[in-house]
C-alpha cells in the first residue's frame, strides 16, 4: 500500500484475491477482505478474485468457501457499492466445477484460467482443456485473464539446439 501511495489511485489497477482455504467462515473471510483493503491502503479494488476455485472437493468446497457462509453475497454487495469494480475467480479444477460456476446466476466480470501458448488442450497439471474453458468464457462475453502462459516457466527454457536455430534465423532478436 505504501508504494502505491506514490501514484494517483486512478492511474492504478489493483488486483488481489480471497485465499480462504482453511478457515472459511463468513467472519474470517470478510476479515481477510478488509485486511487486504487496509494493507493496500485503498477504498476500492479494481479486480477481486475468489482464489483457486475448483480445488478440494470441487462444487462442495466452493459452496463451503463462498455460498453457504454468505461470502459471495457479501462480495456481490461490495461490488454493487463500488468497493469491488470487477469480481471474478481463478480456476484450478475440473470442467464440471467450471461449468457449474458459469451456470450460477452471477455476473462474473472476468475469470483467470491457465493457458499456455503452445498447447491449449493441456494447460495445467490437471489436464484441463484450456481451449474449452476459453471458448465457454468467450461465448458468454466474460474476459479471460491468462495465468502461466509459459507453463510455469518451462516454455522459456529452450534447449541449446532450439536456441541455435532461433539465433540462426534472427540473430539480432532475443530468443524470448
Annotated model-derived regions:
Residues 38-62:
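Active-site groove signature of glycoside hydrolases
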Residues 1, 53-176:
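Beta/alpha (TIM)-barrel catalytic core signal, keyed to glycine-rich beta->alpha loops juxtaposed to Asp/Glu
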Residues 8, 41-44, 49, 83, ...:
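Short loop/turn motifs at secondary-structure junctions
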Residues 1-8:
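Aromatic-lined substrate-binding rim segments of carbohydrate-active enzymes
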Residues 8-11, 36:
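A contiguous, low-structure linker/loop signature
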Residues 23-34:
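Glycine-rich anion/phosphate-binding loops
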Residues 4, 37, 79:
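Conserved hydrophobic residues forming the short capping helix/wall of the S-adenosyl-L-methionine
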Residues 10-22, 44, 48-51, 113-117:
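A short, structured active-site edge motif that brings together acidic residues
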Amino acid at each position: 500500500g505504501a508504494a502505491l501511495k506514490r501514484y494517483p489511485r486512478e492511474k492504478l489497477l489493483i488486483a488481489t484475491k480471497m485465499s480462504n482455504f482453511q478457515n472459511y467462515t463468513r467472519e474470517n473471510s470478510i476479515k481477510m477482505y478488509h485486511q487486504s483493503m487496509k494493507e493496500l491502503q485503498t477504498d476500492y479494488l479494481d479486480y477481486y478474485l475468489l482464489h483457486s476455485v475448483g480445488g478440494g472437493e470441487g462444487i462442495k468446497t466452493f459452496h463451503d468457501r463462498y455460498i453457504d457462509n454468505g461470502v459471495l453475497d457479501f462480495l456481490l454487495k461490495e461490488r454493487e457499492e463500488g468497493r469491488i469494480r470487477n469480481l471474478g475467480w481463478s480456476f484450478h479444477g475440473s470442467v464440471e466445477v467450471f461449468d457449474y460456476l458459469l451456470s450460477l446466476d452471477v455476473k462474473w466480470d472476468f475469470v483467470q484460467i491457465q493457458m499456455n501458448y503452445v498447447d491449449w488442450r493441456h494447460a495445467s497439471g490437471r489436464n484441463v482443456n484450456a481451449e474449452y474453458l476459453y471458448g465457454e468464457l468467450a461465448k458468454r462475453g466474460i474476459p479471460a485473464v491468462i495465468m502461466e502462459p509459459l507453463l510455469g516457466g518451462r516454455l522459456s527454457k529452450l534447449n541449446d539446439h532450439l536456441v541455435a536455430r532461433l539465433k540462426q534465423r534472427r540473430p539480432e532478436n532475443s530468443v524470448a
